[in-house]
Amino acid sequence: VMSTEMGAPISWARSAQAWAGQVHIEATIKAAEEMVWEYSRGTTRIIYEGIGVCSLITPWNWPMNQIACKVAPALVAGCTMVLKPSEIAPLSGTLFAQVCHDAGVPPGVFNLVHGLGPEVGARMSVHPEVDMVSFTGSTRAGTQIAAAAAPTAKRVAQEMGGKSPNIILPTANIAEAVAAGVNAVMANTGQSCDAPTRMLVPRNRQAQALKVAKEVAEAIKVGDPREVATVMGPLV
């Protein structure tokens, strides 16, 4: 499903995309089992409780992982929620809704809505009965969501996109470092928030770095994401 909707090569989708979502759910369960939800501190009683209704807006590049990261903690905390997956990659959200139904999540606790960000996402951010918005996506959309949520003093949690450079120091093994960087940026077809799309190298090692980067890039298998040997599939 994830490979079909956003182009991740099937080998990567199976080993990383599906794995990451499962791991986050397992980690949430473990944290909930270890957490002390109510305790005394001196004469004060500390009680942790769900914040209320949550709007969850997820991106297309890690569809199931991002859904798991947001839905699992909300369920554990006892919140109700509305999930809007990216309109570009809606299949994982639909599948997750079926899983919740089959697992016996009570009606009204988990709700799924599809639609465009500027329309549905905007309404989810501004609605007066929503207590919290959790958003992962672009900086442009994130700033709009924060502004929309401000008048009703909603809590807003955001991870807004940006990519980081490789910083290769003079003492590094240039060939190994450059090869690792190029392979990392191609993972998930280059469509990850942490894809290192820039590389900073000492000026006197630039020619060597370019040579290695070219060799590694040319060896990467580009093709149909349904083929297990494919490393670089189609881009959204």
Question: Can you annotate each of these PLM segments?
Answer:
Residues 1-4, 175:
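Short, structured beta/alpha segment
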Residues 3-9, 39-43, 161, 227-232:
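Short linear capping/connector segments at secondary-structure termini
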Residues 7-35:
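Long amphipathic alpha-helix in the N-terminal Rossmann-like dinucleotide-binding domain
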Residues 15-19, 23, 118, 230, ...:
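An alpha-helix initiation/capping motif
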Residues 37-176, 207:
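Rossmann-like NAD(P) dinucleotide-binding subdomain of oxidoreductase/dehydrogenase enzymes
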Residues 132, 140-236:
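ALDH superfamily catalytic-core signature
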